């Protein structure tokens, strides 16, 4: 069947986003998402484009984003509304601050990946007495520190997220 597409150009900051709409009901018009707005606010507030995730596991969706101006950091949370949670923290002035972690879980594995010449340290944990898993990744890019934490996300999925990071 013939479909008619309408092309829309959105300007988001200095980036252009092209969306397509269709007269067919099974194709939904794309719009600027809350997630994109959070990334744009980070850019506007702190003056840089943060590393972005271009892959999420199935059913994982953006939940909320918070910018802490005084602490010079931002946090973005994704969830599948069941038991999978992904927390992404961006620390602009990490030399003068720290991200505190109190991990009492058992460290199972530690390894390093290199994505676009950026070393990423990954630690895998078993959550005590629950059988659930927890994975942390930490890396630095252009003097910004990034921390990605996942609960109940499979190792392969977590690493796929990392392999699909977009560095600006």
Regions found by a protein language model. Name each.
Residues 142-168:
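Surface-exposed amphipathic alpha-helical segments
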């Amino acid at each position: 069947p013939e479909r008619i597409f309408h092309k829309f150009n959105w300007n988001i900051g200095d980036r252009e986003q092209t969306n397509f709409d269709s007269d067919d009901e099974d194709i939904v018009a794309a719009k600027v998402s809350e997630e994109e707005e959070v990334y744009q606010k980070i850019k506007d507030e702190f003056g840089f484009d943060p590393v972005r995730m271009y892959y999420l596991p199935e059913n994982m969706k953006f939940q909320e984003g918070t910018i802490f101006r005084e602490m010079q950091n931002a946090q973005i949370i994704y969830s599948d509304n069941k038991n999978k949670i992904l927390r992404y923290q961006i620390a602009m002035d990490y030399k003068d601050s720290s991200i505190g972690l109190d991990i009492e879980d058992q460290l199972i594995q530690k390894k390093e990946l290199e994505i676009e010449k950026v070393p990423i340290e990954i630690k895998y944990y078993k959550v005590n007495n629950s059988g659930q898993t927890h994975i942390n990744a930490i890396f630095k890019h252009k003097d910004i520190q990034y921390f990605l934490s996942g609960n109940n996300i499979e190792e392969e999925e977590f690493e796929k997220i990392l392999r699909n990071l977009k560095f600006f």
